[in-house]
Amino acid sequence: DIVLAQSPASLTVSLGQRATISCRASQSVSTSGYSYMHWYQQKPGQPPKLLIKYASNLESGVPARFSGSGSGTDFTLNIHPVEEEDDAAYYCQHSWEIPLTFGAGTKL
């Protein structure tokens, strides 16, 4: 199984500043220009919400202050500027193979 190592586990950022979350896969999840890495936001009592698919593609309706980058094994989620409503847990997830696995999460 592919292991996703997320860092940091928790992150405190002042409103208006930048939050950066990293995700490292135990093997490459990229091929032919596609990276099979996705980012989710989860608030207490709610299901995960897809923010970014295929490393850098913003899901419809998600604010442009969320952005993703990376390829191969190393990926990053950036939030800038951070707003109060961004208080949540963030998870990376790959879809390279079955089983799909998630990172352990980052609490913002």
Curated annotation (Swiss-Prot):
CDD domains: IgV_L_kappa. Residues 61-92 are annotated as: Framework-3. PANTHER family: IMMUNOGLOBULIN LIGHT CHAIN (PTHR23267). Keywords: Adaptive immunity, Disulfide bond, Immunity, Immunoglobulin. Disulfide bonds join 23-92. GO terms for cellular component: immunoglobulin complex. Residues 39-53 are annotated as: Framework-2. Residues 102-108 are annotated as: Framework-4. Signal peptide: none annotated. GO terms for biological process: adaptive immune response; immune response. Pfam families: V-set. It comes from Mus musculus (Mouse). Residues 93-101 are annotated as: Complementarity-determining-3. This is Ig kappa chain V-III region PC 2154. Residues 24-38 are annotated as: Complementarity-determining-1.
